[in-house]
């Protein structure tokens, strides 16, 4: 029953949170895990800090994003699926013609119903992800049709990267490290399966 409990936490609470390398969604995720284990510690590292061969990126958060056609119909809304936005997209708020918009739309022709997961952590870029079926619907619009494009995202150079850790002491000084990622949103493998299994293991060994 305990494993089922953590499965339900993942399904009902973690799956819907938008997460990336940094941001509010990560903190919410870690706080949900902490609510289950008081020994769980949430740590933070400042954006810009050098960690081995990596530099902590600016904190990225997004409030909303959508595409609206000439009839004021919302043909894509970030609220419906976290995968609809390229991770770490730059903000944009403008009208674009069809061909220009299509340059920033990603899909999977061989999996026409699936939404791809795309990121652009280190290159300044913005983009949308949708099923290939959705993309084909946009292609049906006239060449001169314009679309209202909005990505309300922000970068904070004074932000943080957050991570969580817990140490369960055993009978010896030897350690076994178990790690999991939380940075990919709305996917079962492994940014949902990882935290669920990790919570189950914490409960089992403590």
Q: Language-model features: where?
A:
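N-terminal hydrophobic/helix-forming segments and targeting peptides
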Residues: 1-206
């Amino acid at each position: 029953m305990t494993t089922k409990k953590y499965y339900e936490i993942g399904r009902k609470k973690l799956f819907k949170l938008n997460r990336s390398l940094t941001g509010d969604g990560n903190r919410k995720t870690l706080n949900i895990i902490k609510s289950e284990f008081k020994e769980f510690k949430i740590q933070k590292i400042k954006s810009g800090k050098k960690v081995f061969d990596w530099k902590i990126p600016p904190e990225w958060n997004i409030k909303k994003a959508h595409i609206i056609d000439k009839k004021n119909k919302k043909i894509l809304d970030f609220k419906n699926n976290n995968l609809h936005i390229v991770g770490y997209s730059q903000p944009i708020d403008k009208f674009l013609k069809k061909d220009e918009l299509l340059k920033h739309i990603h899909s999977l022709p061989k999996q026409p119903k699936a939404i791809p997961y795309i990121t652009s952590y280190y290159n300044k870029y913005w983009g949308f992800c949708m099923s290939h079926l959705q993309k084909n619907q946009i292609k049906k619009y006239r060449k001169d049709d314009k679309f209202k494009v909005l990505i309300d995202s922000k970068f904070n150079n004074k932000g943080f990267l957050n991570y969580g850790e817990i140490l369960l002491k055993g009978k010896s000084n030897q350690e076994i490290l178990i790690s999991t990622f939380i940075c990919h949103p709305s996917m079962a493998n492994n940014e949902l399966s990882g935290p669920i299994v990790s919570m189950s293991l914490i409960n089992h060994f403590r």
